Amino acid sequence: SNSKMLSSEIASTLGGRFMRVDIYPYSFPEYLAAQGKDKNYLEVLSTKDRAEVVGMCDQYVKYGAFPELVDIRNKREYLNSIYQTIYLGDIMTRNKITNDFAVRLILKKIAESVAKPLSFNRLSNVLKSAGAVLGKQTVINYVGYMMDSYLLFTLQNYAAKLVEKETSPKY
């Protein structure tokens, strides 16, 4: 967890005497390599190999591709512990958020809208209709906290106009 210090706090504390290295989940080819499959593995596949790759793809989609997950038997429990640490430590406690219901709704709505444009106004309206009234700025702040703790990432919107890029971010 990064609940002790987020990267912006590390920079100010260490005064520039550090190098930030972000470690992201595996791409699917990297995931296959971590499973012991040669990089040319996908080029020459028998029927048995195809079935194995489909099974690996299912696991990749279901559990994600954190490098340490390759060797962990109970993946769901491990992922849940990461989520709880980030959610409770890095988001709720660090930012003194007491509206747990609203934060969970924001996460659920973003999760069900993956790769689709989603405005902060829309999120605020969804919360209001569910009984959790939050202003647009509070929603923006909460999503920012989620991004600071690496729970969410934005997907680059390749719209030609700046306004289109910035008004409907994708996560």
Q: Where is each model-derived feature located?
A:
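Sensor-1/coupling segment of RecA-like P-loop NTPase cores
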Residues: S1-I10, M146
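A short linear-motif detector with a strong N-terminal bias
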Residues: S1-N2, K39, S46-K48, G131-A132, ...
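Proteins with a high burden of low-complexity, intrinsically disordered sequence enriched in S/T/G/P/A and R
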Residues: S1-S3, G16, K165-Y171
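A generic "binding-loop/recognition-motif" signal
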Residues: N2, S27, Y158
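Interdomain motor-coupling "hinge/lid" segment immediately C-terminal to the ATP-binding subdomain
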Residues: S7-P117
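Accessory nucleic acid-recognition modules appended to NTPase machines
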Residues: D71-Y171
